[in-house]
Amino acid sequence: MSKQPSLSYKDAGVDIDAGEALVERIKSVAKRTKRPEVMGGLGGFGALCEIPAGYKQPVLVSGTDGVGTKLRLALNLNKHDTIGIDLVAMCVNDLVVCGAEPLFFLDYYATGKLNVDTAAQVVTGIGAGCELAGCSLVGGETAEMPGMYEGEDYDLAGFCVGVVEKAEIIDGSKVAAGDALLALPSSGPHSNGYSLIRKIIEVAGADIENIQLDGKPLTELLMAPTRIYVKPLLKLIKETGAVKAMAHITGGGLLDNIPRVLPEGAQAVVDVASWQRPAVFDWLQQQGNVEENEMHRVLNCGVGMVICVAQEHVDAALNVLREAGEQPWVIGQIATAAEGAAQVELKNLKAH
């Protein structure tokens, strides 16, 4: 009778040694992001973090997100060094719009077969994103799950917690007719609309690795990491106290994201002619024959963040943002919505 061979976890497709090697590789990344409130290092069962000093009535704000199918493009291009920045950006930009300062971040990395080099690149990007946002990378989960993912394909999720003073929560309730809308530029499509983007590339049969737009490779424009707006916006809030609402322009574009922070009866009137749309969006529209309204419903079209302030604070707000290295502009204003009108009106839409 044949003796059954002794099976190990590695035989089943899970390499514990690889997981431990990854942890060693990323300890220094986490250390660089450490805030004074964080207690202990990586490797514990749970991460501990004190509330920063100076808050009277601190309110915790949490968020979770992924990077959508931009990840598929990253895998296809074998480019893993900035997708972690995207992951952090998608979470922290959602927190800062209510006035919150991000405190700590955790990530979830799931794969069929762990490639330590790839995972280390991803986590290094996450660390870079945390540094840009001023939050600590306090832990995460690396799950090697054979049979769940194809080969070394992986998926990502991020989780972030921030804090805001209860009396200073920004919720859009003070937005009023006549207020101004300011915009901050995006770096490209950020992390939204990539299912449409990939479909356009497929239908057009475009060799994106050999196309240049404005002197830059198209792949670079499509993979440009999502901008992290935390530090300029926190500076704006602290120095002016004038911010009434902010909208992170993600999936759904201007049309779906601005209404999330508008009170009933308010309408945002946005002048599409107030900025030059980056070439990557024009290329996508042309190659996919995408209708103008659909462009603004799916993609950010060059606008990453919209900020509402009273008219008398416009100049001060623009100055503070410029001091912080931003290139803001006035994109529109708040009006009283007519009966049955949409909450966002796009003016000067170009004919398609």
Swiss-Prot record:
Major place of residence: cytoplasm
Annotated Gene Ontology cellular component terms: cytosol
InterPro entries cross-referenced by the UniProt entry: PurM-like_C_dom (IPR010918), PurM-like_C_sf (IPR036676), PurM-like_N (IPR016188), PurM-like_N_sf (IPR036921), PurM_cligase (IPR004733)
Class of enzymatic activity (EC top level): ligase
Keyword Ligase: yes
Family: Belongs to the AIR synthase family.
Protein known as: Phosphoribosylformylglycinamidine cyclo-ligase
